[in-house]
């Protein structure tokens, strides 16, 4: 390389693996004082290594091919035409998806398919995992993935293989994954660095090494969930099986294995491992399929007592009390998730034997009927996370007016619809049942000094001393509470507790759509590290203390009934605010004004059913960073000043959105130098409403609502007259899978955001 010192050169270093190699290249291979316009290009799979080689502006991240381009490449490589695929056209789509849009994978698969008839393509797709192991034409692709695995540091190899327990194309939430890694002992604390932060760094490192694919990113650019490339997963499962690391059960698998030292089992079908297996070796059990048909319940045998992780969240059947009655036997459990997101759960009480799980760190009991945390929980001083948002009444198809047992029982007797079965299954739990989505916490909660996440606490049903003790949870970072119908005294105790939580960075207070949060004005010194704030309930005006939250990144307000200029002026001063969510009468003024020099860091604006807002105005020199506007459910609203938003990329008008002057808005969008996208969910004809006609319609609707409210109030006070109305139809929405309201630090839905704060 000495001869390059005085020459102009162009060098490509392909597939660089380590930073040490790059440092050697810098020190010995390439002259640093060459001023002849030379260039060096480095290719690598590691984003972190790329950043060592160059600044962000000189890094090009190769994107997967678009589906059409990927399909064309596959057909061209396999020497087939589109006409050849008419009988089984979707097989191309499936193969392209399997390859993840990666050109190298498509070329290798296409090369194999070139030797096969079209009729054989589906069989090849079905047996691709075994083809990767046996087909010489695919050996290079398998070898490339194994090489990537072998280059992982030792602390990442187990973390990576653990991903093989999840089904193909499954969205894996970072929070769940990191908590499971911690429970399994894959992650160790480093000095003063929080163990969760170490786990997050492992997660990011796997992304940077292109071993996993980001699937959901929040407004700050933080990756909240990931997926594993299909072919990468096939090879990963093969490695995990060869190393006796994970055993997967599925309907097409045999139900016995000769190896006796698998560490993790994942159920994807209805098959069950035979009892001849030595269960004592298993350390984690995860359920994704149907209830096993053999052996029958209970799900877990006494011989599985060495389990560290038990996760039933992905089960396609309702968890029952019988399934978890012996939970106290699993003394080594560190991670427990018993709330199924795929089916009704009939668990309404935590067994008191849970107090024997002294090492338990994570307790997930959401999507259950559990409404009370037992006293025994206070003995589990290793607990770091309790998430216990219970099944809401709407999940059963009930109305909130059914506040008493008599109403619900009578409703069941006189109706014959799809809810009857669901209600019958819950009859034993009615004495534990409440219509609120929180759970009561016991006295002694302050003993849980390691606790960092606690949600959702029902303040009304919790003891006053327990509420006071919340302020003693000095490590608490995320708190969710419901205050519907809570007394003023308990709300004041909650205020005092919040002021003591100096580590809190996420707070969610829900008083329901007609409840009051005006007691929040009495907060004098809020937790200054707070980054995420969600308030649902009437505020009247914005509390002054919100202006002191200089680290606040996300704020969501619902049913707040805010008005006047103070609201937007105060919010506009928050220097780090990136996401503003206003929902259903959060603001009740006619003009929502984003003033000059306000909202310096705002990136996303989400407005949902602003019943009284008629215009959204962006003044000059406002919201310089605003890139995305989502508007749903508002009527006769006019957007003014889009031209003043230099970085806007997308304006989305969702279901129920009605724009008064859509043509004017489209004109501003078309004239904008940034060429933003204007998305319309509903037809153009639904917009351009005449304001005068709209005002008359709104008045008529308001009168109807008032009359309906009076009738409902009267009928709730008189049970017998209500009986005659009970046969009304109740609309039931059964939400499954990743669409279930779950984690979020961006508040609205799992499909677009994630509720985990920061």
Which residues fall in each region the model found?
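A conserved switch/coupling segment of P-loop NTPase cores
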Residues: 1-65
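Mid-core helix/loop region of P-loop NTP-binding domains shared across ATPases and GTPases
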Residues: 1-12, 94-98, 198, 202
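Surface-exposed helical/coil interface segments that assemble multiprotein signaling complexes
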Residues: 3-5, 30-35, 85-86, 112-159, ...
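Cross-kingdom leucine-rich repeat
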Residues: 3-4, 9-10, 34, 251-263, ...
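Short, polar loop motifs at secondary-structure junctions
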Residues: 17, 44-50, 269-272, 292-293, ...
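Alpha-helical sensor/transducer elements of the RecA-like P-loop NTPase core
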Residues: 37-90, 108, 123, 140
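A short helix-loop-helix "switch/interaction" segment in the helical subdomain of ASCE P-loop NTPases
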Residues: 90-101, 148
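The conserved phosphate-sensing helix
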Residues: 99-108, 153-158
């Amino acid at each position: 390389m000495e001869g390059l010192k005085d020459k102009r050169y162009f060098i490509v270093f392909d597939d660089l693996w380590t930073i040490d190699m790059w440092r050697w290249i810098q020190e010995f291979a390439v002259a640093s004082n060459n001023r002849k316009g030379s260039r060096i290009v480095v290719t690598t799979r590691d984003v972190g290594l790329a950043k060592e080689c160059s600044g962000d502006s000189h890094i090009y991240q190769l994107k997967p091919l678009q589906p059409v381009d990927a399909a064309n490449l596959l057909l061209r490589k396999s020497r087939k035409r589109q006409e050849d695929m008419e009988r089984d056209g979707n097989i191309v789509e499936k193969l392209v998806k399997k390859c993840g849009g990666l050109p190298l994978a498509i070329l290798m698969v296409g090369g194999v398919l070139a030797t096969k008839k079209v009729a054989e393509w589906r069989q090849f797709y079905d047996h691709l995992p075994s083809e990767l192991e046996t087909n010489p034409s695919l050996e290079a692709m398998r070898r490339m993935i194994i090489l990537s695995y072998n280059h992982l540091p030792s602390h990442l190899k187990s973390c990576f293989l653990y991903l093989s327990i999840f089904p193909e194309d499954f969205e894996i939430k970072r929070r769940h994954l990191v908590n499971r890694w911690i429970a399994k002992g894959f992650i160790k604390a480093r000095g003063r660095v929080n163990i969760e932060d170490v786990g997050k760094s492992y997660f990011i490192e796997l992304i940077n090494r292109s071993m996993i694919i980001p699937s959901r990113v929040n407004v700050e650019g933080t990756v909240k969930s990931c997926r594993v490339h299909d072919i990468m997963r096939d090879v990963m499962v093969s490695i995990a099986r060869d190393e006796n690391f994970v055993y997967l059960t599925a309907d097409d698998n045999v139900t016995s294995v000769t190896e006796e030292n698998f560490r993790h089992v994942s159920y994807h079908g209805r098959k069950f491992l035979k009892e001849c297996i030595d269960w004592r070796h298993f350390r984690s059990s995860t359920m994704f399929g149907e209830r096993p048909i053999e052996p029958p319940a209970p799900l877990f045998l006494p011989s599985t007592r060495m389990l560290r992780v038990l996760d039933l969240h992905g089960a396609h059947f309702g968890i029952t009390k019988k399934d978890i009655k012996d939970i106290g036997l699993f003394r080594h459990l560190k991670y427990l998730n018993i709330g199924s997101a795929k089916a009704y759960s009939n668990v309404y009480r935590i067994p008191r034997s849970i107090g024997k799980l002294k090492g338990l760190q994570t307790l997930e009991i959401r999507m259950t009927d559990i409404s009370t945390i037992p006293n025994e929980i206070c003995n589990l001083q290793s607990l770091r996370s309790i998430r216990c948002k219970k099944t809401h009444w709407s999940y059963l198809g009930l109305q909130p007016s059914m506040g008493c047992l008599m109403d619900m029982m009578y409703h069941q007797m006189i109706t014959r619809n799809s809810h009857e079965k669901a209600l019958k299954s819950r009859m034993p739990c009615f004495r534990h049942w409440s219509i609120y989505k929180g759970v009561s916490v016991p006295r002694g909660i302050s003993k849980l000094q390691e606790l960092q996440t606690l949600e959702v606490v029902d303040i009304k049903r919790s003891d006053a001393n327990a509420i006071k003790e919340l302020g003693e949870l000095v490590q608490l970072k995320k708190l969710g509470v419901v205050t519907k119908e809570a007394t003023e005294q308990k709300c004041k105790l909650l205020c005092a507790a919040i002021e003591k939580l100096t580590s809190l960075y996420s707070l969610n207070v829900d008083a329901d759509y007609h409840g009051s949060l005006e007691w929040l004005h009495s907060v004098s010194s809020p937790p200054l590290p707070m980054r995420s704030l969600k308030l649902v309930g009437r505020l009247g005006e914005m509390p002054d203390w919100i202006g002191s939250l200089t680290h606040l990144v996300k704020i969501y307000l619902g049913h707040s009934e805010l008005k006047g200029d103070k609201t937007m002026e105060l919010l506009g001063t928050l220097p780090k605010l990136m996401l503003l969510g206003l929902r259903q009468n959060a603001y009740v003024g006619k003009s929502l004004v984003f003033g000059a020099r306000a909202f310096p860091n705002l990136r996303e604006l989400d407005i949902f059913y602003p019943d009284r807002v008629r215009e959204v105005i962006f003044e000059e020199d406002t919201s310089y960073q605003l890139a995305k506007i989502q508007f749903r459910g508002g009527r006769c609203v006019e957007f003014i000043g889009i031209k003043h938003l230099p970085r806007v990329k997308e304006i989305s008008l969702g279901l129920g959105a009605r724009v008064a002057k859509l043509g004017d808005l489209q004109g501003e969008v078309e004239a904008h130098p940034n060429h933003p996208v204007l998305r319309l969910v509903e037809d153009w004809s639904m917009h351009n409403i005449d304001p005068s006609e709209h005002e008359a319609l709104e008045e008529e609707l308001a009168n109807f609502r008032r009359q309906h409210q009076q009738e409902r109030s009267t009928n709730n006070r008189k049970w017998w007259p209500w009986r005659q109305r009970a046969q009304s139809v109740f609309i039931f929405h059964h939400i499954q899978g990743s669409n279930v309201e779950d984690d979020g630090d961006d508040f609205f839905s799992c499909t677009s955001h994630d509720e985990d704060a920061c």
